[in-house]
């Protein structure tokens, strides 16, 4: 017999593990990421809706979730098990939009609150009442689960019937293959909340892929499972049952209890109740699991232990997916950093070669001071430096885009494209740098005797030409020394070089950081991987 040793330390470890799973982010579209996101959702659903609530309240009723494909007759089966219509059934698809939980009146308190399925708003329907609760009563049944207030767009309708034994609750879930995505998602969440998985299929669909995926998942978790082969024509009953049993055996599920419900007039359209005799074996099996202590312990304990043991495999898989996300984010980040680092080196090399002193700037320099004023020379040098930086940023962005196109993960962030505002930002930064250099020249001239002091704008023009002209403007340094003295010129050029370096680095760093901002906003960090493994390690020690 499977037994559970429920200690506070185990619950604390599970809660910590749950928080670590919730903190996982998988935003990058890597191969395997959709599966990892599904694993994360399933883990949260099982921890929030099943494992933690079950371990905290071992005495709570056994919850059997009725799941299956479209048209399998789940709602009709639930209605027939309880002896009256509690769940909407019919030929229109999808039928079960709002899941319905049915329990004995004495057990209603277990589900009126948010002990399980905390994200679903309760809609309480006492026995015999035909209308939904008023808004005021509905508000009273709202609670707060692990994720906060329940979603008002997702409801769990609760019915009580005295025909169900105490200690047993049935939950009619939406179709697992519903065309409505929200229904499929909800069906998966509800199944994760089950002590007993009741898989319903039909004679015409028992070999379909989706029901078998559910069966294999139950086997993977070692959950307590029962299958119902529904709506089987009488003339095919023996043959279909034999074939279905053979399929289960080949899948390693030969020991799973199987129940067969024949095709009956009441099955047509899903509007009637099946005779009690048609569902009596299943009813008796479920009731035994609720009322017999040993059978109950076996059913509940097997599912809980199965989920616990599955964490040893699923958590490392999730941690591996987190690591892959971080590795991809590092590759994307490195491509940006390397592109801008390369262009930064290229800009400095171009400055030393005198690339700024070209075109209009070179013409102005050659005409200075006879045909060109200091302001005109400064304007042309600033414009040339701005153009050099704009070309560097554009080249870096092209290199980044080329590298990112080879990365599947780059699909989560926009590829760098020409930014019409980048030129304006760079121009503003260069003008600010120019103003700082002008202030530097003014300060130096201010320390000189007024009679011999040159004009500050002339000093600034020669200084900028010397800083940006490279080999082509060697005369600028000599002329600057003639104007203010050798020592002052050296001191001024040293301070000016520091300003050039810092401002160029700042411009490129600003543009680089703007390219990294969308990636940084995804918050793909390495910490969650280590935290997942650490939380699993603590849990394993507490088991």
Predicted regions and their residues:
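Non-catalytic alpha-helical scaffolds
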Residues: 1-84, 169-170, 187-188, 192-196, ...
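Globular "head" domains of long coiled-coil molecular machines
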Residues: 59-296
């Amino acid at each position: 017999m499977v037994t559970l040793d429920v200690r506070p330390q185990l619950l604390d470890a599970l809660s910590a593990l749950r928080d670590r799973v919730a903190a996982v982010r998988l935003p990058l579209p890597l191969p395997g990421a959709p599966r990892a996101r599904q694993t994360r959702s399933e883990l949260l659903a099982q921890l929030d809706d099943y494992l933690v609530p079950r371990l905290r309240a071992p005495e709570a009723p056994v919850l059997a979730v009725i799941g299956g494909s479209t048209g399998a007759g789940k709602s009709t089966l639930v209605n027939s098990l309880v002896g009256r219509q509690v769940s909407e059934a019919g030929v229109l698809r999808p039928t079960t939009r709002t899941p319905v939980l049915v329990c004995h009146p004495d057990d209603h308190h277990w589900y009126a609150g948010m002990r399980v399925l905390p994200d679903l708003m309760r809609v309480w329907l006492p026995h015999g009442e035909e209308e939904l609760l008023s808004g005021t009563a509905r508000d009273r049944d709202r609670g707060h689960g692990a994720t906060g207030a329940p979603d008002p767009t997702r409801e769990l309708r609760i019915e009580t019937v005295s025909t169900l034994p105490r200690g047993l609750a049935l939950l009619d879930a939406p179709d697992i293959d519903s065309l409505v995505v929200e229904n499929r998602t909800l069906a998966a969440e509800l199944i994760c909340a089950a002590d007993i998985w009741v898989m319903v299929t039909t004679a015409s669909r028992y070999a379909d892929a989706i029901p078998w995926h559910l069966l294999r998942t139950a086997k993977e978790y070692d959950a307590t499972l029962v299958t119902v082969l529904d709506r089987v024509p009488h003339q095919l009953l023996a043959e279909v049952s034999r074939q279905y049993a053979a399929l289960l055996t080949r899948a390693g599920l030969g020991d799973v209890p199987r129940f067969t419900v024949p095709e009956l007039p009441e099955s047509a359209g899903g509007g009637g109740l099946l005779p009690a005799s048609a569902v009596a074996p299943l009813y008796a099996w479920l009731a035994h699991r609720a009322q017999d202590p040993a059978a109950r312990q076996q059913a509940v304990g097997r599912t809980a232990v199965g989920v616990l043991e599955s964490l040893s495999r699923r958590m490392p898989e999730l941690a591996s997916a987190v690591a892959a996300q971080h590795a991809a984010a590092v590759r994307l980040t490195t491509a940006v950093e390397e592109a801008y680092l390369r262009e930064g080196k290229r800009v400095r090399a171009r400055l030393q070669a005198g690339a700024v002193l070209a075109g209009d700037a070179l013409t102005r320099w050659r005409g200075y001071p006879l045909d060109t004023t200091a302001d005109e020379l400064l304007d042309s040098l600033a414009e040339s430096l701005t153009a050099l930086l704009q070309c560097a940023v554009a080249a870096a962005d092209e290199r980044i885009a080329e590298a990112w196109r080879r990365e599947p993960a780059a699909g989560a962030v926009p590829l760098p494209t020409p930014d019409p505002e980048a030129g304006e930002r760079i121009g503003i930064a260069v003008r600010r740098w120019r103003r700082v250099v002008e202030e530097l020249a003014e300060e130096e001239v201010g320390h000189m005797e007024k009679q011999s002091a040159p004009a500050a704008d002339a000093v600034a023009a020669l200084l900028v030409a010397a800083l940006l002209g490279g080999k082509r403007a060697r005369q600028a340094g000599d002329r600057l020394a003639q104007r203010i003295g050798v020592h002052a010129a050296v001191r001024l050029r040293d301070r000016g070089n520091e300003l050039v370096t810092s401002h160029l680095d700042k411009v490129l760093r600003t543009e680089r950081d703007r390219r990294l901002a969308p990636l940084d906003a995804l918050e793909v960090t390495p910490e969650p991987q280590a935290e997942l493994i650490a939380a699993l390690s603590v849990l394993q020690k507490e088991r």
